[in-house]
Amino acid sequence: MIDPKLLRNNIEVVNAALAKRGVQLDVQEWASLETRRKDLQSKTEKLQAERNAGAKQVGQIKKSGGDASEIMARMQAIGDEIKAAEVALSELQNEIEQKALSIPNLPDESVPAGKDENDNVEISKWGTPRQFDFEIKDHTDLGEWMGGLEFETATKLTGSRFSVLKGPLARLQRALTQFMLDTHTLKNGYTEAYVPYLVNADSLRGTGQLPKFEEDLFKLQGEKEYYLIPTAEVPVTNFVRDEIIDADRLPLKYAAHTPCFRSEAGSYGRDTRGLIRQHQFDKVEMVQIVKPETSMQALEELTAHAEGILQALGLPYRKILLCGGDMGFGATKTYDLEVWVPSQNTYREISSCSNMGDFQARRMKARYRMDQKKTELVHTLNGSGLAVGRTLLAVMENYQRKDGSIEIPEVLRPYMGGATFID
């Protein structure tokens, strides 16, 4: 959630920033809400002052032995008015908060304006796409030929957009996961975390999925309001919800491997073949909790950590700075990493690394203590390090051989019992 003070006092500044996203707030509506809020608050304060003055007057009259019944009756009436005004003010503040929860984060000054992915800016490329001297297969054909990737079985078990991995491909996915976790924890300084795959609504509100994006989530039916996590970002970032952290503990850096569950609402007909877009997929997520003045530097570091995985695997990729219109709801700045997919002759997203500023922290009431008295909102960051299924398909396609076997990247061989290829 953006700073309510900005909405109250600088709505034009908010709109100027949101213009990069192609979003504009109704200035008159917000001005009207603020006028009503101020009027109700002023009315409540005046009534409270009148009641306090009346209470003193009643005390003085009783002390002198006089009759205070008329004033006491008035005080009772004022009390009823105060209750009504407080209810009205509370309802209005709730209305304002609900509207504010649906406003996306303000883009950083360095973020380009734009509508969609066509307006994103390529920052750099790494690696050269391999030139094959044979007709290549996509990962679906490779996996089915090997007998280790089954979509029909998954459809029988659950439905479309699910998959089953078996044998060497299952082991290769496990190897990728272990390699990512080992790199982030042993080399990059993250603390490994395993978390619940079910979260409550408060957690999803804290990171920004609720209330605006409920249709993208899987919600359990039952007495308790539980949701399957769309990303480990949700439970891990909420570690600091309602917490005040000592400044010397920052930054906090966590890496978590979880399955992720997404309804993919609005993506009907897109990427229906293969592992690109699944309802359930594994991901290693990086989360950082930092001081505000270091968050942009932390974004560069976190993105470099994701790039390091791709470089170690020898997978060509490019780094993209997202424009305002293509950024996620809670981000103030985002880099996407897109890996080369030979069968599609293009780059596809494999990691998204975002600085959320204090957007999530304000929702979560997550602060750090600067001194004995003063506290300030932390900044939160998250990024994929990496999406495991998409990394698997990238390895399969980029390392395929003419006979249909797949060479194992050198850094993964210790996790594969020393094997150099699978078939």
UniProtKB/Swiss-Prot annotation:
Pathway: Aminoacyl-tRNA biosynthesis; selenocysteinyl-tRNA(Sec) biosynthesis; L-seryl-tRNA(Sec) from L-serine and tRNA(Sec): step 1/1. One of its GO terms (molecular function) is serine-tRNA ligase activity. Its EC number is 6.1.1.11. GO terms for biological process: selenocysteine biosynthetic process; seryl-tRNA aminoacylation. It is found in: Cytoplasm. Catalyzes the attachment of serine to tRNA(Ser). Is also able to aminoacylate tRNA(Sec) with serine, to form the misacylated tRNA L-seryl-tRNA(Sec), which will be further converted into selenocysteinyl-tRNA(Sec). This is Serine--tRNA ligase.
